[in-house]
Amino acid sequence: MEAAHLLPAADVLRHFSVTAEGGLSPAQVTGARERYGPNELPSEEGKSLWELVLEQFEDLLVRILLLAALVSFVLAWFEEGEETTTAFVEPLVIMLILVANAIVGVWQERNAESAIEALKEYEPEMGKVIRSDRKGVQRIRARDIVPGDIVEVAVGDKVPADLRLIEIKSTTLRVDQSILTGESVSVTKHTEAIPDPRAVNQDKKNMLFSGTNITSGKAVGVAVATGLHTELGKIRSQMAAVEPERTPLQRKLDEFGRQLSHAISVICVAVWVINIGHFADPAHGGSWLRGAVYYFKIAVALAVAAIPEGLPAVITTCLALGTRRMARKNAIVRSLPSVETLGCTSVICSDKTGTLTTNQMSVCRMFVVAEADAGSCLLHEFTISGTTYTPEGEVRQGDQPVRCGQFDGLVELATICALCNDSALDYNEAKGVYEKVGEATETALTCLVEKMNVFDTDLQALSRVERAGACNTVIKQLMRKEFTLEFSRDRKSMSVYCTPTRPHPTGQGSKMFVKGAPESVIERCSSVRVGSRTAPLTPTSREQILAKIRDWGSGSDTLRCLALATRDAPPRKEDMELDDCSKFVQYETDLTFVGCVGMLDPPRPEVAACITRCYQAGIRVVMITGDNKGTAVAICRRLGIFGDTEDVAGKAYTGREFDDLSPEQQRQACRTARCFARVEPAHKSRIVENLQSFNEITAMTGDGVNDAPALKKAEIGIAMGSGTAVAKSAAEMVLSDDNFASIVAAVEEGRAIYSNMKQFIRYLISSNVGEVVCIFLTAILGLPEALIPVQLLWVNLVTDGLPATALGFNPPDLDIMEKLPRSPREALISGWLFFRYLAIGVYVGLATVAAATWWFVYDAEGPHINFYQLRNFLKCSEDNPLFAGIDCEVFESRFPTTMALSVLVTIEMCNALNSVSENQSLLRMPPWMNPWLLVAVAMSMALHFLILLVPPLPLIFQVTPLSGRQWVVVLQISLPVILLDEALKYLSRNHMHEEMSQK
């Protein structure tokens, strides 16, 4: 049943043809079950393991590698001679890479499905219903409850379905619905109709929602929605409908894969076609088919060379290292790709409660009456420091600290705060923090009493556990609480009846202490406490007191105010009818006003500076809260989201104001707004959608079940460590300390990771370009193979992989949070940078071919043939006069490939040292600024010597040890790459940067 909150309870019962006393008949239950189904959230139909495995092979790069592996297997099968064993190494290594990637991918997918399943923890096992087939209340499985059932709930119960309240069987009914609405305090419910068709869930005070908890009271309601039709079920449907977006990095790598696949296809076909004339050369036994297969192998080698096989592993390692650094800053990342996405965040949509504020209600102001006569009323005003539940703080009047025990009014105010209170402070020894036990508002009063210490209790020798309630305990030893008149909506107050624990010198007897909404309490006051005496409360005094409270409640502070009062001569408790809550207001009359406290959920001290950093970094901060607009705007001003006098028109909206806008106006509002108040979960999702339509990268925080769809939809969903399992499962990141400052630290880390990632991706790609140029040149010029596929795999995965990973440890730029967020569409490599790394790659390719050629032509241990003979080596035979006196087996020597491989590895190590900074010279940013890079380079060179010297590795990699003279030549060919890159960096700093600035 939709909009049950609009109708009187009797009309809702009539709709279901049921009575509150009799309940549904068995026939009605059967009909409803057939119509609505069971009262449970269906399990998510996850993908099968096979489907998940197949998904991992949808990536274009992976498919190219898979094809290369399959072709290599086929070619290896037909190999002859000593290469039979080594031929299988290459396809096996590629397959191992693909299997490892698939395992990681499947594991991550399995984790992602837990968000929807986590919703089930909010479904109760059992429910209490009234049905006509049995007298009284019966317990049934919650899944068997149907719309129309009469359901009973009491304190401690989890609500089993969405209920329209029809009767409250206690003084009050309070419900913790924070998982659904995000409200930090429990909500008082009632049974009257709410004639507002656009009421948000927070305003539906006559409804109980499935999965929420009863914190006090007892009530009966009629089930109006079950299963997927409940508010919890709607959230489940929203989450199931959200398709996870690919991160900017994933999209860039997809695009890179497409471009690379096209380039590989063109180059491979070109190499094969260009060499058609050589298919029938004598080296192939005169067989055209064998020649075609030989050049097909070269084309496959080219594909292997062009694909940076180590890139997925290096990116994963870099992101994993980033997550460890973030975890040390209290940001726990659940999804690796989102680490990089943080770096291009342009909007942070943050909850107010607990993230921007401490979520620890704190009294920051109070007043008692100093003087009162017929014409005026003077107040003693005090400020209190401290923003958490830690019972430490200073009470000041003006600029001067005061001893509260010197003010009789403050002694009585502290007494009321301590006794008219059902909550307490507790020290959590495991966490090392003070925590509330009970309601946030009352805990703030308990904490205030500890700060005031009106009886000058010696607190020095106390442990923290004892300190939590020391001053409150002293007051409670003087007065004994007899009973409590609970809060009710009509009188907006609560009170306690107390008697002295020992005879008072003045003969003082029982008292009633009252706290509540100022207008309601002051209306029932006839006098006011001035020090230790009582004075009449005149209309002038009443108005001055209310004016001060209005000022506190509506100014820049928007404090939540509570009035405190005493009834000095209450009726005897035997004469009071405590079963009839309608009489409570009669007992809370003829009151004496004592004072007023103003409290707020204080902003976290470090947040204002973090918001300033966000603005410097070009990131817009938007507060989203369920609180009213006035409070939200006031907190925004305190935090610097709005200026002190800034006009907030068009920059702050309530959920209802937002709904009143046209779709296009809503889009524009999301582009300019910095505050949304009184919003529902659906608003959050719409805000994210609108921001995404402007290509904004949005980080969205949340902690409740209601936040899960928006967390899943946003590029970066951020859940609170204290939040629900559903929110954490739907989010990419969890803040263990619930602190906004941790988000900003994570964004900074994300930017640093992206900067480093660009360095190692370009480093790896320049290596691949060099390998492609090398193979392409040897094929075009008709030279012997300089590098074979298994060597290329070794370089791409191992020798290049270690320095590339170490580049992830590069120190971040000092101005990293002073730059605008980069566009998610910004290419990894484009324009000038593409030319730079193409130039380096071409040098790498030329150098490797030159090294192999040098051995054939110039090396003392080589055959000393000329370049023309080398180009025509495939025509070598005993009958060919061109090769007279030359052993044709020399073209199978391992020396030229070893020379080429050694030059490739050495140049790549030089490239790695050059990559500490994108544009800074090695003289300004030397390699030792990243010690891990030096270690990685040393390890890569050690591994290179390992394959040269330790059997059976030389056989597998087709290499052989080099002489000292040959190593000198390797260094002579390799080291100039440093000078080339320094020249390109110089141009980049002094010319390209100026051109980009002018643009």
From Swiss-Prot:
Catalytic activity: Ca(2+)(in) + ATP + H2O = Ca(2+)(out) + ADP + phosphate + H(+)
Annotated family: Belongs to the cation transport ATPase (P-type) (TC 3.A.3) family. Type IIA subfamily.
Annotated positions of the Phosphoserine modification: 17, 25, 662
Binding-site positions, Ca(2+) 2: 304-305, 307, 309, 796, 800
Keywords: Acetylation, ATP-binding, Calcium, Calcium transport, Endoplasmic reticulum, Ion transport, Magnesium, Membrane, Metal-binding, Nucleotide-binding, Nucleus, Phosphoprotein, Sarcoplasmic reticulum, Translocase, Transmembrane, Transmembrane helix, Transport
Activity regulation note: Inhibited by sarcolipin (SLN), phospholamban (PLN) and myoregulin (MRLN). Enhanced by DWORF; DWORF increases activity by displacing sarcolipin (SLN), phospholamban (PLN) and myoregulin (MRLN).
Membrane topology qualifier: Multi-pass membrane protein
Single GO MF annotation: calcium ion transmembrane transporter activity
Binding residue positions for Ca(2+) 1: 768, 771, 799-800, 908
UniProt cofactor(s): Mg(2+)
Region (Interaction with phospholamban 2): 788-808
Cytoplasmic membrane side: 1-48, 111-253, 314-757, 809-828, 918-930, 986-999
Protein name: Sarcoplasmic/endoplasmic reticulum calcium ATPase 3
Residue intervals on the Lumenal side: 70-89, 274-295, 778-787, 852-897, 950-964
